[in-house]
């Protein structure tokens, strides 16, 4: 062999061993790493495959009840915290600011128990019929059906159960007043109503003061009746009055009676007056005739049905939900043209996407990426709006830092409505009370206890949090009621107090719906036609029928209930086809006829348990099955439902002939 041949052979030998050593190094590094399983749909504790024992089912629909989330007001946070810590908190419940038991509602509706569903919902959402029309439904954004098709229509189901409850004739009696103490609630918005009901349940006498002639706060004065019919609002508030709420409308604190007098006459006071004044931009022309604030415009449109814009061109400044409400109301009260201008690009607008879509359908013109520069006027009257190009709204860190271009656009108009935010008006209320405002004019309040700087005076709602949602205001009312109860019982406001847990759920894109069976898709809310709804303030959303509601509720996966609902996701996920699931193939049936696990095929990867939306599928302590030789071995339904001790059951645990109590005509998962 020549010298060159020897060199080539040596080079190949060295290269081969280098490859082997490199591979061993990679293998060693991987071996030292922690094994990782798929984090979908929720992160779980990561276990090595050899420490996963045989699978079992904790429960099964038709044999086991779905647990309901219920408790007395002071203990509710503790219940939610316990469920969260033990991974038994349904995402829809955890993502709701008030922790309304949407899962329990869906279960009861699917069972045909709509009145019971209403009573369950009202424990935390004191106005189910109202929120069933206007809530921004964060529960639906956390719904696990987003992974597979579309979320369950929780908000429309709130409305349905409220409508069914209203049809019943029930003997409502006042709640007993057992405490001998009186609490004053100033303001009849959602926060005040929630606190009032909690305090009445605890045995206190509650007196509520409202400066307007009708109760409801911003729900009455600010939400258009095409979204929230006034009879629905007043009917639900009347229900609270029947429970013993002493409601006094037409009484303005600071004018008709002083705040100091209210504090003197009551054992505790809750201030929840909301935000009563619109903010205006400090730009030239903002004092011209024809310039209005959003709240003033909405009050005129809602109360009088005439905001003085008949036949006029209206320009709305703002991109939030209030701005969209103003624009849609302007169309309904006879404006000849309605335009909406905002800083944000179309995909950045802070309003809910469905709100602006409905506004565009009704003829509103959106001018995005435009900043208000000045109001054009002649002889003191509005003749137009000058806009400047807005290049960006937020900086790289996500902070509000708009950048403007040089280009401007003049838009002819007769009326300009500022819908850029609201502020509180507390000057006359706090005089001589010990209540203090900070340098920005905002009431000083302890964020964890709702206590103000005046002893025995608490605050909640938007006067504390700023502009927000109705359900968020309701949540602050619950917390304030808890603090008032502690105060009146002589307890420390913060000691051993459990704050409401705020789980973080991953944001995700909607599932691809191509090929999804139509019976699995969400029941869409029937809507009035755009050409019909712009002529008056009749409701835009028409509501689900009773049958549609039952079918929609049956789509709920009963997440974290530890009860198998027959969704078959485990069988579809299993890479080794070790799971076989069969159920009765009839409309309305949610009972399994077969659940088999072929242990000889199972690779103990854990994907099925991680995929299970209800947390019903879990690993037992039968670790030996995961790494010793496994003969042909199949667990049937009865064995899958055995107890958690690891001992195989010999029978079928009394479920040979499932009664299928969840049959409903025309419903299907």
What are these regions (language model features)?
Residues 55-111, 125-154, 192-194, 462, ...:
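Cysteine-centered iron-sulfur cluster-binding motifs in ferredoxin-type domains/subunits
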Residues 116, 177, 182-186, 234-283, ...:
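Feature captures the FAD/FMN-dependent oxidoreductase FAD-binding
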Residues 205-208, 212-243, 247, 301, ...:
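Rossmann-like dinucleotide-binding cores of NAD(P)H-dependent redox enzymes
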Residues 182-207, 323-331:
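N-terminal Rossmann-like FAD-binding beta1-loop-alpha1 element of flavoenzymes
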Residues 326, 460-488:
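A conserved FAD-binding loop/helix module that cradles the flavin
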Residues 287-312, 395-467:
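FAD-site-proximal beta/loop scaffold in flavoenzymes
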Residues 161-177, 235-255, 278-333, 437-448, ...:
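Glycine-rich dinucleotide-binding loop and its adjacent helix/turn
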Residues 1-15, 65-85, 152-182, 201, ...:
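Flanking helices and flexible, charged tails adjoining ferredoxin-like Fe-S electron-transfer domains
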């Amino acid at each position: 062999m020549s010298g060159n041949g020897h060199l080539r052979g040596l080079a190949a030998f060295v290269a081969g061993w280098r490859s082997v050593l490199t591979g061993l190094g990679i293998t060693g590094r991987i071996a030292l790493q922690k094994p990782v399983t798929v984090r979908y749909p929720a992160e779980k504790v990561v276990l090595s495959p050899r420490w996963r024992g045989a699978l079992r089912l904790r429960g099964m629909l038709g044999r086991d009840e779905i647990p309901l989330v219920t408790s007395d007001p002071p203990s509710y946070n503790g219940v939610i915290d316990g469920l969260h810590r033990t991974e038994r908190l349904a995402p829809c419940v955890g993502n709701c600011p008030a922790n309304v038991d949407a899962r329990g509602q869906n279960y009861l509706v699917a069972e045909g128990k709509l009145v019971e569903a209403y009573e369950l919902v009202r424990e935390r959402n004191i106005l189910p019929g109202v929120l069933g029309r206007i809530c921004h439904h964060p529960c639906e954004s956390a719904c696990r059906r987003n992974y597979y098709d579309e979320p369950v229509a929780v908000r429309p189901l709130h409305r349905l159960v409220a409508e069914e409850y209203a049809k019943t004739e029930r003997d409502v009696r006042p709640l007993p007043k057992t405490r001998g103490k009186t609490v004053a609630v100033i303001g009849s918005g959602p926060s005040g109503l929630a606190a009032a009901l909690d305090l009445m349940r605890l045995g206190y006498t509650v007196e509520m003061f409202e400066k307007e002639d009708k109760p409801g706060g911003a729900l009455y004065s600010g939400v258009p009746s095409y979204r929230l019919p006034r009879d629905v609002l007043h009917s639900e508030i009347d229900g609270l009055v029947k429970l013993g709420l002493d409601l006094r409308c037409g009484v303005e604190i600071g004018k008709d009676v002083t705040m100091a007098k209210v504090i003197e006459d009551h054992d505790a006071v809750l201030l929840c007056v909301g935000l009563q004044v619109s903010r205006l931009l400090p730009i030239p022309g903002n004092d011209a005739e024809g310039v209005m604030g959003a709240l003033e415009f909405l009050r005129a449109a809602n109360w009088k049905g005439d905001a003085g814009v008949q036949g006029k061109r209206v320009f709305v400044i703002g991109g939030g939900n209030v701005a969209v409400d103003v624009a849609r109301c302007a169309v309904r009260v006879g404006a000849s043209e309605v335009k909406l201008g905002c800083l944000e690009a179309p995909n950045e607008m802070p309003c809910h996407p469905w709100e602006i879509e409905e506004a565009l359908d009704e003829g509103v013109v959106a001018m995005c990426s435009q900043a208000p520069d000045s109001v054009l006027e002649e002889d003191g009257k509005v003749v137009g709006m000058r806009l400047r190009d807005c290049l960006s709204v937020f900086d790289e860190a996500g902070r509000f830092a708009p950048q403007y271009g040089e280009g401007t656009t003049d838009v002819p108009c007769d009326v300009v409505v500022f819908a850029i935010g609201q502020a509180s008006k507390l000057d006359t209320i706090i005089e001589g009370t010990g209540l203090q405002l900070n340098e920005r004019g905002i009431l000083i309040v302890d964020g964890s206890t709702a206590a103000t700087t005046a002893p025995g005076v608490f605050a909640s709602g938007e006067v504390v949090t700023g502009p927000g949602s109705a359900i968020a205001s309701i949540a602050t009312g619950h917390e304030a009621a808890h603090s008032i109860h502690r105060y009146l019982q002589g307890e420390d406001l913060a000691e051993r107090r459990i704050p409401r847990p705020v789980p973080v759920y991953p944001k995700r894109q909607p599932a691809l719906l191509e090929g999804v069976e139509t019976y699995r898709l969400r029941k869409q809310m029937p809507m009035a036609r755009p050409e019909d709804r712009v002529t008056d303030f009749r409701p835009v959303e028409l509501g689900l029928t009773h049958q549609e509601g039952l079918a929609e509720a049956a789509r709920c996966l009963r997440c974290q209930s530890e009860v198998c609902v027959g969704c078959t996701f485990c069988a579809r996920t299993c890479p080794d086809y070790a799971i076989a699931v069969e159920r009765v193939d009839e409309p309305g049936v949610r009972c399994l006829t077969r659940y088999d696990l072929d242990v000889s095929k199972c690779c103990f990867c854990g994907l099925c348990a991680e995929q299970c939306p209800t947390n019903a599928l879990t690993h037992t302590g039968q670790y030996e099955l995961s790494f010793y030789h496994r003969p042909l071995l199949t667990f049937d339904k009865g064995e899958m439902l055995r107890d958690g001790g690891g001992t195989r059951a010999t029978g079928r645990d009394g479920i040979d002939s499932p009664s299928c109590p969840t049959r409903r005509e025309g419903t299907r998962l």
